């Protein structure tokens, strides 16, 4: 089968769907020129493929090597329906490429009059200069130039030249497609790993920042007592299910090193510059999580969990909490598969009871409805996002576990929280597990909250 980039270019929707259904495929990877599958589908006008990629979570504002977004390509090739679709999904209408051109520069230059009108109607700036001091309207033929100026003025735009600044995108994050070769290696040679700095050490092992094949990675070395052939076999069998590349809100395990030859069983995953949601909320990173960012994180997590809940069988021993959610370079929250416990890791022990549903603390895993229990954990994450506090921070894990399970200890919702979030939290934290919603039911609610 041809590669995914060819299938997207040619509009082979059936082949693209089959490729997307394989969880080991990463739809946000790039080719040699940094074109993602979405870039190619937008450039060639493949509407059905564009729709499919967006619905599966393709990044809308991803940039190729020349900093063109999919909107730049759709606009320059006059694919009006695709331009509309990208704008509907919040494409950055004034995204600047390496020459300082925005999508409107290209629509004007290539004579895509209708696309240019659509862009201006949606807020594209007619007077923004590129690196060479040219405005989009400078590129347009005279009749279109006058029309666009008139439209922009009606919409309240100031028609004075906006000089090019190298800082146009400084407040935003530039998202590049990921290296597509990373998901090809499941077994990794331990000797190829370059260890740069130890990040953390706890009961379950050591966490290191490293490099592998020119990429920044995180290396997780598991501490396992009495390593045996049987545990080694379980490790080999359980690892492949954690290599989920097909959803943007799930962070896959890239690969693993068996022990021996590695000193310990080892997992490799993508380096996340902001660390975990716990780091971002409680350990003073550089950016502020305002209400709209909090809703976006909640939506990201709900989408990731909705996807994981479609898998049959469910991935066992996955615990949802703020330490097991990672924050990507473009502020996307991703459920970390490297935090899933293996069958041989401390069975029966709970290390983050503050996020665990009461029934999961009281019963054996096989007697608990995992999907409902995950929804409770999500409600605690919502509480954490709006309060910026660690749940039950003044108690030990042992006390939390006992009090939540036996004494009805619950997070208290402080006054002043948005009534919508408050209501959602209460629904997700219903004492009756059977009455809690499913993740695919709360995704649309969070989408509405985001739009507001």
Swiss-Prot record:
ANK repeat extents: 2-30, 31-63, 64-96, 97-129, 130-174
Keywords: Acetylation, ANK repeat, ATP-binding, Cell junction, Cell membrane, Cell projection, Cytoplasm, Cytoskeleton, Magnesium, Membrane, Metal-binding, Nucleotide-binding, Nucleus, Phosphoprotein, Repeat
Residues the entry annotates as binding ATP: 200, 202-204, 270, 272, 279, 341
Motif Nuclear localization signal per record, residues: 363-371
InterPro entries: Ankyrin_rpt (IPR002110), Ankyrin_rpt-contain_sf (IPR036770), Kinase-like_dom_sf (IPR011009), PK_ILK (IPR035692), Prot_kinase_dom (IPR000719), Ser-Thr/Tyr_kinase_cat_dom (IPR001245), Ser/Thr_Kinases-Pseudokinases (IPR051681)
GO molecular function, one term: protein-macromolecule adaptor activity
Residues holding Mg(2+): 339
Keyword Nucleotide-binding part of the UniProt annotation: yes
Modified sites of kind N6-acetyllysine: 426
The Protein kinase domain, residue ranges: 193-446
SMART domains registered for this protein in UniProt: ANK
Residue numbers of Phosphoserine PTMs: 186, 246
Cellular localization per UniProt: Cell junction, Focal adhesion; Cell membrane; Cell projection, Lamellipodium; Cytoplasm, Myofibril, Sarcomere
UniProt xrefs under PROSITE patterns: ANK_REP_REGION, ANK_REPEAT, PROTEIN_KINASE_DOM
PTM field: Phosphorylation by PAK1 modulates ILK subcellular location by promoting its nuclear export.
Transmembrane segments annotated in the record for this chain: none
Subunit details: Component of the heterotrimeric IPP (ILK-PINCH-PARVIN) complex composed of ILK, LIMS1/PINCH and PARVA; the complex binds to F-actin via the C-terminal tail of LIMS1 and the N-terminal region of PARVA, promoting F-actin filament bundling. Formation of the IPP complex is dependent on protein kinase C and precedes integrin-mediated cell adhesion and spreading. ILK also interacts with LIMS2/PINCH2 and with PARVB and PARVG which may substitute for LIMS1 and PARVA in the IPP complex; PARVA and PARVB compete for the same binding site.
Described purpose of this protein according to its UniProt entry: Scaffold protein which mediates protein-protein interactions during a range of cellular events including focal adhesion assembly, cell adhesion and cell migration. Regulates integrin-mediated signal transduction by contributing to inside-out integrin activation.
Protein name (Swiss-Prot/TrEMBL): Scaffold protein ILK
Protein's gene: ILK
